[in-house]
Amino acid sequence: MEDLTVEVRGSNGAFYKGFIKDVHEDSLTVVFENNWQPERQVPFNEVRMPPLPDIKKEITEGDEVEVYSRANDQEPCGWWLAKVRMMKGEFYVIEYAACDATYNEIVTFERLRPVNQNKSVTKNSFFKCTVDVPEDLRESCSNENVHKEFKKAVGACRVYFHAETNQLIILSASESTVKRVNILSDMHLRSIRTKLMLMSRNEEATKHLECTKQLASAFHEEFDVREDLMGLAIGTHGSNIQQARKVPGITAIELDEDSGTFRIYGESEEAVKKARSYLEFVEDFIQVPRNLVGKVIGKNGKVIQEIVDKSGVVRVRIEGDNETKLPREDGMVPFVFVGTKENIGNVQVLLEYHIAYLKEVEQLRMERLQIDEQLRQIGMGFRPSSRGTEKEKGYVTDESAASSVRGSRSYSGRGRGRRGPNYTSGYGTNSELSNTSETESERKEELSDWSLAGEDEREGRQQRDSRRRPGGRGRSGSAGRGRGGSRGGKSSISSVLKDPDSNPYSLLDNTESDQTADTDASDSHHNANRRRRSRRRRTDEDSSLMDGMTESDNASVNENGLDDSEQKPQRRNRSRRRRFRGQAEDRQPVTVADYISRAESQSRQRNLPKETLENGKKEKVKDVIEEHGPSEKVINGPRATSADRALKPQTTPTERNNASCQDGSKQEAILNGVS
């Protein structure tokens, strides 16, 4: 403001020092020194420029001078017009010309100056320029020190910011200043903006320095966060940092974005650690066995979602087989979790517990499978309960063991076979007698029949023998189901056992008397009696069939037209039947047709070699006794088939009686397997 100093004439004629603040059309806004008068507008004619400071002072007696003095104590000093009357050394006697009466005063040389020759200012004495200031720079432009270099560059007398118009005002006494202002104004504003930024950083640095000095003796922690997790650490709109700053005892939280480093300062260690728990986000992985991955995820991700919700982790990711970023163990799949350290610890506890639970469940399941496998290897073990549900019947147990618990009867399988070498049916009465009813002679006779049979027939017999049930459900032998009682006055095996000396062939008398020449007729009569009791359904789905193959000895072709050797024996239906019947009901009368083969068997016999026929004749007596005895349903021996009988020579009743008389004693001993 020194450059805009002017002298304003007062009402008493003295000139007082003032400063130009603004330039108007016909006046100037002047501010007085020390504000002894308020700011006011002064016309141009009452304002003049001060003299140059380097003017040479040469004062002699009689010269007009200006004296720096004041009229009273209330007014400041001003330049008054006076005249030198006397000089004596450095002291001057002056006389004021402004006063009506002469007023003399002795003053020193410093208070004197020559008369100011400058005239009053005019409109063209000052030049004014304005520059609009942006809003962000208005506060900075209010400080006149910011425009110091700009003022010097443009040659302005004064540069200041006008708050009402938001403009930068440049006042100058030179016209060239206006041109310079137009050139440098934009650059000046940019420099102000740059300086403002630097100044603000310096201020922050100063504050930080002061804060650091204060916190040097306090608690602080420093930790790094990965760049990809920095967004999670800061939070949405800095929510995590704000939450950490709200922790009681936290004085400052600093973040270095370049290195991802957090610095937390607080009054206590607990407060600092708590604030750190909000900001420290990490990524960690947990190894999960491959066979348990599906169970850890759960149906529709239910299990893993529950773990994530309870632990508080932000993300979960399953490492793929083609990814090799993380170390992988054999048979393990890494589960990658992202969250705070506390969240990672929570998810680790939950996941380890769940994996341990799944392993225990798997171990129990394997033990269950091992027990099941042992039960299968032992075979058909004890059933826990026959009333159990279908799911409880999944264990395979042995039916024979279960049947032994239920009763004395043995049901060893419901199919064909499953006959052990010591198999004994529970259907027979007096099973011990039934098992021992076969004598050595009968076995020899069966062996002889076996030797006479061909290879094909032997195989067929072996197959049938493997399916036979010794002592089970026979209708004609004594080893059957106790149905050999007499009926209608007919002879029975009991009469033979009571009187061993009697003729055993008396059992055949009733049957031979009813023979006829027509073999087919007797055959049909023989089968008619059996159909009454043999029409039984093999299974629930099959219709009733004639049990011709198993009930008759001379039936070589069954009712379906298939040879017995080619067809599998029908599966017997184990129906409940009365165990005790009359012996005569099951026992059938033996006729000549039982010992005479059909026409097919006769034609087959004619084609046999002579040696086979001769061997058959030698054994005819034994064959006859086997037909009348219980050999058809022997307990443990094979059953003769129609093919075996076809190989035997046919005999008449007379020849059979003669042969029986010759070996009567021998046959009596082996009749029905009882000696």
Swiss-Prot record:
Biased composition (Acidic residues): 511-521
Ranges of residues in domain KH: 222-251, 285-314
Signal sequence range: none
Domain of life: Eukaryota
Basic and acidic residues bias: start-end ranges: 608-631
Biased composition (Basic residues): 527-537, 570-581
GO biological process, one term: post-transcriptional regulation of gene expression
Gly residues bias locations: 473-488
Record region (Disordered): 381-675
Stretches the record annotates as CC1 domain: 201-208
Domain-related comment: Disordered region at the C-terminus undergoes liquid-liquid phase separation (LLPS) for the formation of a membraneless compartment that stores mRNAs. CC1 and CC2 domains are required for homodimerization and FXR1-network nucleation. CC domains also mediate interaction with other proteins containing similar CC domains.
Protein name: RNA-binding protein fxr1-B
Species name: Xenopus laevis (African clawed frog)
